[in-house]
């Protein structure tokens, strides 16, 4: 690719150092100076090899002078021809691959060739090149010479005068009669690295995915802090903009147009289309706009500030009308601590920033072309909505949990027993990955994997240390308390839920009461304690009796059929039933001797017996499901409950009185 860029003729160029008078032919190459040739533009081709030029430290570099001859510098198409040869003599195959060329016009030549004939030791700061080689060819000639100017060469040169940031010729001579220019460099090029060395393996990207997420979160948090501080100046800026809208609008538009035109002529670098090559456009470097410059430029806009709120995905088009966003703020949601929600909201905010940058670039293009400030909001909205399916993006393209082929196990409670399957089938279902860390496993090493009874998957020896634990599914389905080998992840999960009451036998394993007699006995005691505890809470003299309930977890006496793994193991060992019986005995003794508790009992209305009965007497008492009254089991008839009959008669009486009054 060949690109041209012009420089102002009056641009200051400092003299180059090391000027001497010398002319001649180097390495037997013919002299390229032709005084009869008509003046034409100078062609300077910048060529860079795709490999990095590295100078070994142990190799003694031999200096070799490079000659070039030019006529007197002028403004009418002066030609600049340089002869250069690499000391190490790189092969043509190394210099011929993937080269980028840049043609400098006569103005550029005039600026470069205006060196002082007397010489100077100052460094040139107005002309810098970063390509590996500079090939300068005079139009009409087939000879091409190379000048190594790679920053890598400059950086590894053992000589202190070499600068790694700028291209600085060692010697430059402008003869009065011939205008010869001599350039000398000391370089040794070695193409010792292949391009594959600089390519990261896929495994590294997979393993470091959490680093990318951490960087995104840290970047978002730091941006939030900055935005909170910038919000304090929002009010003053808005007042300033509103005051200048009426008076300075024409000046603002003129300033905006001028800055955009200056930006178009700035020094930029673009991709040349060839591997490892870049095209440099040599032009005056324009000053980068600061935050306050952008604010002054955008005085003519109506919407000055852009507010990006987490969770407010539908209001993104309201901010698209702003051409240059000057302030962004992020607000918090109540459930901001959720990791999945945080990732989704971060993705939304980054997409909003992306769409705003697209709008700004479209606005700048429209201003430079037609001078209008018109943004097609509807088009931007459609494009944004079509490319912003957050759920699909996170699920398929940017999965946080592992990769598309593997995902780490989830923190979940499994209530089913895994059927026995062949090892090869299970590992094949895992895509030959370790279920814990995602390490690929070759088929010949499948036998070394270890099976986890809780998850029903195979793990490597790093993720499975032969830890043993009870399986909840086997306890609830088969009343099996044997310990089985589980993975490290499963062991940690089961230990974390060991004391948590999350197993409701009424909904999970109701048939378990018939299989386990000790569990059925605990169920009966638990029902009595459930009712008597309610009665004791209403008595102001039952403090000593209520303290007895502190010996067991609260869920055993507050709710029915609710157990933890620890409770089930204690029931199996026979440790929980005696403790519950002692608590029940102390509670019954208090109720029998307390007048307040006796006054809250029931009298059986069927037999009219004066003995007080209570709901916790499950052996002799039965409660009506409708009115919750207590009766003797042998006396109770659900179809003829006296209390329910009285309630029905009272309701009918009230309805009849209300109808008669109307």
Curated annotation (Swiss-Prot):
Changing residue 157 to A does what? Abolished phosphorylation by MTOR, leading to promote interaction with STX17 and autophagosome maturation
Q: Which keywords does the record carry?
A: Acetylation, Autophagy, Cytoplasmic vesicle, Lipid metabolism, Lipid-binding, Membrane, Phosphoprotein
Q: Where is this region: Disordered?
A: 1-34, 58-131
> What does its record list under induction?
Up-regulated by epigenetic drugs, such as azacitidine, and artificial transcription factors (ATFs)-induced treatments in cervical carcinoma cell lines.
Positions with biased composition (Low complexity): 58-71, 114-131
Extract one GO BP annotation from the record.
Answer: autophagosome-endosome fusion
Tell me the protein's name.
Protein associated with UVRAG as autophagy enhancer
């Amino acid at each position: 690719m060949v690109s041209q860029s012009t420089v102002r003729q009056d641009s200051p160029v400092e003299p180059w150092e090391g000027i001497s008078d010398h002319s001649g032919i180097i390495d037997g190459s013919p002299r390229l100076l032709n005084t009869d040739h008509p003046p034409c533009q100078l062609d300077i081709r910048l060529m860079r090899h795709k490999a990095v030029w590295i100078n070994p430290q142990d190799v003694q570099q031999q200096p070799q002078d490079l000659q070039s001859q030019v006529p007197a510098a002028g403004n009418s198409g002066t030609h600049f021809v340089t002869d250069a040869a690499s000391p190490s003599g790189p092969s043509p195959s190394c210099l011929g691959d993937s080269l980028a060329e840049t043609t400098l016009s006569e103005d550029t030549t005039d600026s470069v060739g205006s060196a002082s004939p007397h010489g100077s030791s100052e460094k040139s700061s107005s002309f810098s090149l970063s390509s590996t080689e500079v090939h300068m060819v005079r139009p009409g000639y087939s000879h091409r010479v190379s000048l190594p100017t790679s920053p890598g060469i400059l950086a590894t040169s053992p000589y202190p005068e070499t600068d790694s940031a700028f291209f600085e010729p060692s010697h430059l001579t402008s003869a009065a009669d011939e205008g010869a220019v001599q350039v000398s460099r000391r370089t040794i090029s070695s193409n010792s690295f292949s391009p594959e060395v600089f390519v990261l393996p896929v495994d590294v990207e997979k393993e470091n995915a959490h680093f990318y997420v951490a960087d995104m979160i840290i970047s978002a948090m730091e941006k939030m802090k900055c935005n909170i501080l910038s919000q304090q100046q929002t009010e003053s800026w808005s007042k300033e903009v509103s005051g200048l809208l009426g008076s300075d609008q024409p000046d603002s538009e003129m300033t905006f147009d001028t800055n955009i035109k200056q930006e178009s002529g700035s020094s930029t670098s673009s991709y040349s289309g060839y591997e490892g090559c870049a095209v440099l456009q040599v032009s005056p470097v324009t000053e980068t706009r600061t935050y306050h410059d952008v604010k002054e430029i955008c005085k003519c806009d109506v919407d000055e500030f852009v507010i990006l709120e987490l969770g407010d995905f539908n209001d993104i088009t309201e901010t698209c009308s702003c051409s240059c966003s000057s302030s962004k703020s992020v607000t918090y949601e109540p459930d901001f601590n959720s990791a999945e929600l945080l990732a989704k909201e971060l993705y939304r905010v980054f997409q909003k920033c992306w769409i705003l940058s697209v709008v700004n670039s479209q606005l700048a293009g429209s201003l430079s072309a037609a001078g209008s400030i018109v943004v097609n909001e509807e088009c931007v909205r459609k494009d944004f909505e079509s490319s912003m399916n957050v759920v699909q993006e996170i699920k398929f393209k940017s999965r946080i949990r592992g990769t598309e082929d593997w995902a780490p196990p989830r923190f979940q409670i499994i209530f089913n027993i895994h059927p026995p399957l062949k090892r090869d089938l299970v590992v094949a279902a895992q895509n030959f990955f370790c279920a814990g860390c995602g390490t690929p496993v070759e088929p010949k090493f499948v036998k070394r994997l270890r099976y986890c009874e809780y998850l029903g998957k195979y793990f490597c020896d790093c993720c499975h240390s032969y830890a043993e634990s009870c399986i909840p599914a086997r306890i609830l389905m088969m009343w099996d308390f044997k310990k089985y080998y589980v993975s490290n992840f499963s062991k940690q999960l089961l230990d974390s839920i060991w004391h948590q009451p999350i197993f409701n036998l009424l909904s999970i394993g109701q048939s378990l009461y018939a299989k386990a007699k000790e569990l059925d006995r605990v169920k009966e005691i638990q029902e009595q304690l459930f009712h008597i505890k309610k009665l004791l809470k209403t008595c102001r003299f039952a403090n000593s009796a209520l303290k007895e309930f502190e010996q067991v977890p609260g869920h055993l006496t507050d709710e029915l059929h609710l157990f933890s793994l620890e409770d089930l193991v204690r029931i199996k060992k026979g440790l929980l039933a005696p403790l519950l019986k002692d608590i029940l005995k102390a509670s019954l003794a208090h109720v029998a001797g307390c007048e307040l508790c006796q006054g809250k009992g029931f009298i059986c209305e069927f037999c009219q017996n004066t003995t007080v009965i209570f709901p916790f007497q499950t052996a002799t008492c039965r409660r009506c499901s409708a009115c919750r009254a207590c009766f003797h089991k042998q006396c109770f008839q659900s179809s003829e409950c006296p209390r329910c009959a009285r309630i029905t008669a009272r309701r009918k009486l009230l309805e009849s009185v209300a109808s008669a009054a109307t």
